[in-house]
Amino acid sequence: MKLRAPFALPLLATVFVLLGLHLPLAAQTPAPKPAPTGFHADLLKDFKSNSIISGSGSPVPLKRIADKKYLFFYFSGKYCAPCKIFTPKLIEFYKKHAKTGNFEIIFISEDPDADTMRQYMSEASMPWLALRFGDPAVKKIKDRLQQKGFPMLFLLDENDELIAKPELGDGDHVSWNPVKVWQKANNLPVTHWKFDYKALQGH
């Protein structure tokens, strides 16, 4: 028996249902993407999808930050003499603990332009991430941390609370304090680093 058009579509839909299939009778609106989960939800509100970059300049997914409990923000610049001494020491710390640690370091450039920033990251062989030069989030983070100089290192916990900032102590470089705070929080031996200002000669 030949089915008339008015009865064909309902019957076809019934067959699809019995087979466990869905008949696409009308286009549906795509479901909204779920909100990012993890740490640093408050901080990441100010970040765009391309705000964070690798040493090569490629965008890095924000999830890489959200997966880390602690965040270090490192302010530095290519033409800063003290930075030339502090940066290698920080790289040494990063390479020793990054694979097993629960932190990430984000470099914020104090250089005059993006090209100089890229040169600095390349020449220093920085292994960590960076905030894209000129990104709107830069000013917000500076205001949040009340950063007024460099080299400066700050440490935030998973709730984006500032738990360590540069300060004098035991003769260490002022920005070594956040490293010691992180070591204490993770039950690791606290290392001290005496900053030799005489080493600035020739830089």
What are these regions (language model features)?
Residues 69, 76-79, 149:
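Short pre-active-site segment immediately N-terminal to redox-active cysteine/selenocysteine motifs
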Residues 49-70:
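A short beta-strand-turn-helix
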Residues 26-53, 176-178, 193:
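N-proximal helix/coil linker or "cap" segments that precede and/or mark the start of modular domains
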Residues 112-149, 154:
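Thioredoxin-like thiol-disulfide oxidoreductase module
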Residues 1-6:
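N-terminal secretory signal peptides that target proteins for export/translocation
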Residues 158-203:
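Thiol-/selenol-based redox modules, centered on thioredoxin-like
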Residues 10-24:
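Bacterial N-terminal signal peptides
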Residues 75-91:
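Conserved redox-active cysteine motifs that mediate thiol-disulfide chemistry
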